[in-house]
A protein has these predicted regions:
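Non-transmembrane alpha-helical segments in soluble domains
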Residues: 13-16, 38, 64, 90, ...
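Short catalytic-loop micro-motif centered on adjacent basic/acidic residues
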Residues: 25-26, 47-50, 74-78, 210-213
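ADP-ribose/adenylate-binding Rossmann-like module
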Residues: 43-56
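Short, solvent-exposed turn/loop segments enriched in Gly/Ser/Thr/Pro and often Arg
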Residues: 29-32, 54-55, 80-83
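NAD(P)-dinucleotide binding in Rossmann-like oxidoreductases
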Residues: 186-197, 201-220
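N-terminal glycine-/serine-/threonine-rich beta1-alpha1-beta2 phosphate-ribose binding loop
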Residues: 1-45, 61-73
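Predominantly a Rossmann-like dinucleotide-binding segment in NAD(P)-dependent oxidoreductases
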Residues: 70-75, 80-191
Length: 220
């Protein structure tokens, strides 16, 4: 029967030492992704990491340095790149059906404010990032497929510049005030991440991509 390792935040290290796996799939909370990936590579395993791969530039460079030092692969598992619709369109692009791609638009838009009332699972930790960062917290679901369509970082074109702007942060504070007790943590911790974040990316060849994030606004 499959073995289970639990009971502490570092039990994965015991698993790495005892099982010596060839590869590790990491689907923990965001703050632990990079650290577990680096430890996995140092123990001889390839690391496959859920989105996002890391939450800081320092973590990203640690991943690069560790991968190069250990000669182990480290891949962010951006699952939307492999969706049926996305792969169909990628195939059409590569066959020349679509023509020259000059502009793309991508987004991660769906309402997650009900997570504010959760005490277990993703809702127990994910809202915290909306109190710490004002930016696009989750760009790659939309940006990943568009980057593939444009063949970015695979030859002559790549990301060159980005400008991002956020709306005011109103929705999460309003939801907490209406639906949660006055002494709840989310009524005593202000949210700073704008309800809508819009970024424009320019590539080296001058192509443009609009990327949006909105996990807060109520939508049908």
């Amino acid at each position: 029967s499959p073995l289970s390792y639990s009971g502490g935040d570092t039990e994965y290290l015991t698993m790495l030492k005892e099982l010596k796996p060839d590869a590790v799939i990491i689907s923990t909370d965001w703050s632990t992704h990079a650290g577990i990936a680096c430890d996995s590579m140092k123990h001889g395993a390839h690391a496959f990491v859920e989105v996002p791969l890391a939450v800081s530039l320092e973590e990203l460079w640690n991943l690069v340095d560790t991968s190069e030092a250990t000669r182990k692969h480290c891949m962010m598992m951006e699952n939307v790149n492999y969706g049926r619709d996305e792969l169909m369109f990628l195939n059409m692009v590569r066959q020349g059906v679509i023509g020259d791609l000059l502009h793309g638009e991508a987004a991660y838009i769906h309402c997650l404010v009900t997570q504010l009332g959760d005490t277990r699972g993703e809702g127990a930790w994910r809202p915290e990032y909306h109190t710490r960062i004002n930016g696009n917290l989750y760009p790659t679901h939309g940006l990943g497929p568009v980057a593939q369509y444009m063949n970015l970082a695979r030859g002559e074109d790549h990301f060159s510049r980005v400008a991002a702007f956020a709306s005011p942060a109103l929705g999460r504070n309003a939801y907490a005030k209406k639906h949660l007790p006055a002494d709840h943590r989310w009524n005593n911790t202000p949210f700073i991440c704008g309800d809508m974040n819009t970024a424009i990316v320019k590539t080296q060849l001058g192509r443009t991509i609009v990327v949006q994030l909105d996990e807060t606004s109520p939508r049908p």
